Regions:
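Histidine-rich, glycine-flanked metal-binding segment
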Residues: 1-55
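C-terminal cap of metal-dependent C-N hydrolases
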Residues: 326-329, 380-445
């Protein structure tokens, strides 16, 4: 890979926006400053005042491999990710087979090697009967342990109280949870099926997967974490109700200590609400459900106010045909990695928070939370995972979607910013119009 110098950039990093230059030597950031001069053999990239960010780290994706490659795979979805400025991803364990032991975990890493355009990590999964495997997790091998405390794909719903207690007691890595109470959901679903049959209106989804189901399950997770002093990260907060359960303040406190219990929300909870079901139907059916406009507003404020610590995508593609089945057969999940950062930048344009705050939630915080080694920041010596943002509007078109499923819930949406360039490990991966070069993603290292 060629060394290069980015000049005339507006660097966004660690709470600051400042004019400067950034040098990349090999796969690393070698210098950050002002007035840097090009060396022999260096390519000069003129940022022309555009914002230069560290690459985003998405701590929640479902790239569907192995077992569901007809709708997505590591190669296709990592391509969409780098086109969207996401340079690292952490993939969920509810594949087929699920990632419930070390052999399945290492199989995923082997699949990604040489095929992933973004850097990659894979979660270990918990089930009702793999506590011994959980106890043997290598903390350097995975970002964390995913516990589905709500309905999931495959044998991954953990609803045995003794097993849950043992998992929270014995895990050697952070626990990340999907919190919805399955019995509550099943009871409400039965009522709606009695009324509508299989073709339940999409706008009923947030009533079926209710805020009460979220709250009950989240309270259980918090109680177990406090009982065992477990490092807990609650995923995809979707309700205003849950926000009061979490500590307000920075992930890393002024004294250097960190929150033990953290929470994340996702881009679709910032950009959609109940009113959008009429237009988009099952395209925005996801678990937990997109809820009311008041929830959307409260979640946006909570992200700005440091109640929520991380922004992610929960990218979960399904085919267009699957999404147009009747409600009970239409799967939950939507493709998001390609347009997540540009969608989040709309919150910046709207004044909800600044670019530096967005970078904190979508790059710095995931790196800190999961102890990702030398990524997530613009720092000398760190890997050169970079994103150049251009404030030129564009409209999402289906023909530009890179995810294998071939559609986006943002089709027809005009965003005020676009991704001009993405670099992964010092190599250009996206030039603003097309993918560039070979897959350069590497296995994420966890500095534990």
């Amino acid at each position: 890979m060629a060394d290069f110098l980015i000049v005339n950039a507006r660097l966004v990093n660690e709470g600051r926006e400042f004019e400067g230059d950034l040098r990349v030597t090999g796969d690393r950031i070698s210098a950050i400053g002002s007035g840097l001069s090009a060396r022999n053999g260096e390519t000069v990239v003129d940022a022309a005042g555009r914002r230069l960010l560290p690459g985003m780290i998405d701590d929640q994706v479902h790239f569907r491999e192995p077992g569901m490659e007809y709708k997505a795979d590591i190669a296709s979805e990592s391509a969409a990710a780098v086109a969207g400025g996401l340079t690292s991803f952490m993939d969920m364990p509810n594949t087929s087979p699920p990632t419930l032991n070390n052999a399945a975990l290492e199989d995923k890493y082997a699949r990604a090697a040489g095929r992933a355009r973004a850097n990659y990590g894979f979660y270990f999964g918990a089930s009702n009967d793999n506590l011994a495997d959980v106890q043997g997790i290598d903390p350097k091998a995975t970002p964390g342990l995913k516990v589905f405390m709500g309905a999931s794909t495959g044998n991954m719903l953990v609803d045995n109280p003794e097993t849950l207690d043992g998992i929270f007691r014995d895990t050697p890595v952070p626990i990340i949870t999907h919190c919805e109470d399955t019995p509550m959901i099943d009871a409400i679903l039965a009522q709606y099926r009695a009324k509508y049959g299989d073709d339940i209106p999409a706008e009923c989804h947030p009533d079926i997967r209710s805020r009460e189901a979220c709250m009950k399950s989240t309270l259980l997770a918090l109680s177990l974490a406090r009982k065992h002093d477990t490092r807990l990260h609650v995923l995809h907060i979707s309700t205003a109700d849950e926000l009061a359960l979490f500590e307000r303040g920075p992930l890393v406190r002024p004294d250097g200590s960190r929150k033990r219990i953290t929470a994340e929300t996702c881009i679709h909870f910032l950009r959609f609400d109940r009113a959008d079901y009429a237009r988009l139907g099952h395209q925005i059916k996801c678990n937990p459900a997109i809820k009311d406009a008041a929830d959307r507003a409260a979640i946006t404020r909570a992200l700005a106010d440091d109640v929520l610590d991380v922004l992610a995508t929960d990218h979960a593609p399904h085919t267009w045909e699957e999404k147009h089945n009747p409600y009970v057969r239409a799967p939950s999940g939507l493709p998001l990695v390609q347009y997540a950062l540009t969608a989040a930048l709309e919150c910046v344009h709207e004044g909800s928070f600044g670019t530096a705050h967005l970078v904190q939630k979508f790059a710095h915080a995931p790196a800190q939370l999961f102890d990702v080694k030398e990524r997530g920041f613009l720092r000398e010596g760190y890997f050169a995972d970079l994103v150049l943002v251009d404030d030129t509007p564009f409209t999402v078109r289906r023909e530009d979607v890179l995810s294998k499923c071939g559609w986006s819930p943002f089709e027809g949406t005009t965003f005020r910013s676009r991704i001009a360039s993405t670099w992964v490990n010092g190599a250009l991966a996206w030039d603003g119009k097309a993918l560039v070069g070979d897959a350069r993603g590497r296995r994420l290292e966890f500095d534990r």
